[in-house]
Amino acid sequence: MKPRYRLAVERDAEQLLELTLRAYEPIRKLGIRFAAAHADLDLVLKNIRENACYVMEEDGRIIATITLRMPWGKQPGPYGVPHIWWFAVDPDTGKKGIGTKLLQWLEETILRDTLKVPFVSLGTADKHPWLIEMYERKGYVRSGEQDLGKGHITVYMKKQLRHDL
């Protein structure tokens, strides 16, 4: 069945929390303090209400999620463009490229073609053993670092989406 992409709604919160906590278990084991890794239902609801939280469904079940924090929102990214965060894939789906498909859909359909943004940003932890390299393989480049007081250095990354702006 073809995956379905849509904005999350409040009734998705419990399913998103369960998926997020399972997906971020390795992050917790590494001691990295990403907000999503320690989410509760209130934080999931806040994310849905304040940001553009997207889900990917298969057979009516949420299998992945990704969120955009907008420059005009309460927690903007560093560059005045939408900022990716809270990216999680159901670990039970196996290595099927689901995260890649969701990220590509977000970059192309939402960011490039709908919002017409020239680039997008994200942040990850310098201590994470493979996320920086994964994003570099997907076309992201390092663009800065900042100590946000979370016990790691946040590495900011950008990806150019449009060259005509």
UniProtKB/Swiss-Prot annotation:
Disulfide bonds: none annotated. Gene3D superfamilies: 3.40.630.30. Disruption phenotype: Cells lacking this gene almost lose the ability to grow on 2SC as the sulfur source but are still able to grow on sulfate. Moreover, in contrast to wild type, they highly accumulate 2SC when grown on fumarate as the sulfur source. Addition of 2SC causes growth inhibition of the deletion mutant but not the wild type grown on sulfate as the sulfur source. Its EC number is 2.3.1.-. The keyword Transferase applies. One of its GO terms (molecular function) is acyltransferase activity, transferring groups other than amino-acyl groups. It comes from the Bacteria. Pathway: Amino-acid biosynthesis; L-cysteine biosynthesis. The keyword Metal-binding does not apply. SUPFAM superfamilies: Acyl-CoA N-acyltransferases (Nat) (SSF55729). It catalyses: S-(2-succino)-L-cysteine + acetyl-CoA = N-acetyl-S-(2-succino)-L-cysteine + CoA + H(+). GO terms for biological process: cysteine biosynthetic process. Pfam families: Acetyltransf_1 (PF00583). Keywords: Acyltransferase, Amino-acid biosynthesis, Cysteine biosynthesis, Transferase. Residues 3-162 form the N-acetyltransferase domain. Belongs to the acetyltransferase family. Fumarate mediated succination of thiols increases in certain tumors and in response to glucotoxicity associated with diabetes. Therefore, S-(2-succino)-adducts such as S-(2-succino)cysteine (2SC) are considered oncometabolites and biomarkers for human disease. The demonstration of a metabolic disposal route for a S-(2-succino)-compound paves the way toward the identification of corresponding pathways in other species. Catalyzes the N-acetylation of S-(2-succino)cysteine. Is involved in a S-(2-succino)cysteine (2SC) degradation pathway that allows B.subtilis to grow on 2SC as a sole sulfur source, via its metabolization to cysteine. Moreover, 2SC is a toxic compound in B.subtilis at high exogenous concentrations, and this enzyme relieves 2SC toxicity via N-acetylation. This is S-(2-succino)cysteine N-acetyltransferase. It comes from Bacillus subtilis (strain 168).
